[in-house]
């Protein structure tokens, strides 16, 4: 039983406990559901993208510089998140904490930029009720931004556990699972950047 619980000691730390392996498998299934959710939101957005109701158009409001900053912050955070997992596998608690905190700061910067963006759009007359396009836009990006915010608080909780328990197969599996979640959100953002912003800046 002990062997079954701890598994192969040569495996990455996050896979060394049966609980960790099952949690990782379960999270992959959860990500499948998330893919369905965002696919539905993207499909809805693309159906509504030309329905601006004669109101403000996306190319009149979208700001290239802000979008590029947001993209930079999130993509770099994916890189730093990957480094944190690498440090975890090296057994460096300090490295995990440092790179995870950097990831959180970059994520917080992204959320701050998105909130600023939304406030600006609403001030300029684009809101959920302005048109079908803006309704689809705010729901899609708001859902993504909410996921990023949840991820930030989730990872903060993992950092607290790391401080109390250190690097164990259990905490390592949580770090790895949170990294999968974070990378998934980065991939979703790439689709948002391409399908929403680039098309919007091109006048739909």
Curated annotation (Swiss-Prot):
The chain crosses the membrane at residues 27-47, 66-86, 95-115, 140-160, 184-204. It is found in: Cell membrane. GO terms for cellular component: plasma membrane. Its main location: membrane. One of its GO terms (biological process) is aerobic electron transport chain. Its EC number is 1.10.3.-. Keywords: Cell membrane, Membrane, Oxidoreductase, Transmembrane, Transmembrane helix. GO terms for molecular function: cytochrome-c oxidase activity. The keyword Oxidoreductase applies. It is a multi-pass membrane protein. It is an enzyme of class 1 (oxidoreductase). It catalyses: 2 a quinol + O2 = 2 a quinone + 2 H2O. InterPro entries: Cyt_c/ubiquinol_Oxase_su3, Cyt_c_oxidase-like_su3, Cyt_c_oxidase_su3-like_sf, Cyt_c_oxidase_su3_a-hlx, QoxC, Ubiquinol_oxase_su3_dom. It comes from the Bacteria. PROSITE patterns: COX3. Belongs to the cytochrome c oxidase subunit 3 family. Catalyzes quinol oxidation with the concomitant reduction of oxygen to water. Major component for energy conversion during vegetative growth. This is Quinol oxidase subunit 3.
């Amino acid at each position: 039983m002990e062997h079954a619980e701890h598994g192969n000691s040569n495996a990455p730390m996050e896979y060394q406990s049966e609980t960790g392996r099952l949690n990782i498998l379960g999270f992959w299934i959860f990500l499948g559901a998330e893919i369905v959710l965002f696919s539905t939101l993207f499909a809805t957005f693309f159906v509504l993208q030309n329905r601006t109701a004669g109101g403000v158009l996306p190319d009149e409001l979208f700001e290239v510089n802000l979008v590029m900053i947001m993209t930079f912050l999130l993509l770099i955070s994916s890189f730093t998140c990957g480094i944190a997992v690498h440090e975890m596998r090296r057994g460096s608690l300090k490295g995990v904490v440092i790179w995870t905190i950097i990831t959180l700061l970059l994520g917080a910067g992204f959320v701050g930029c998105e909130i600023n963006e939304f406030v600006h759009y609403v001030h300029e007359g684009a809101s959920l009720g302005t048109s079908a396009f803006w309704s689809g836009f705010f729901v899609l990006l708001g859902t993504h931004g909410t996921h990023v915010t949840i991820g930030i608080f989730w990872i903060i909780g993992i950092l607290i556990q790391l401080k109390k328990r250190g690097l164990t197969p259990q905490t390592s599996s949580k770090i790895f699972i949170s990294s999968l979640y974070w990378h998934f959100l980065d991939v979703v953002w790439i689709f948002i950047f391409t399908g929403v912003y680039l098309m919007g800046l091109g006048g739909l």
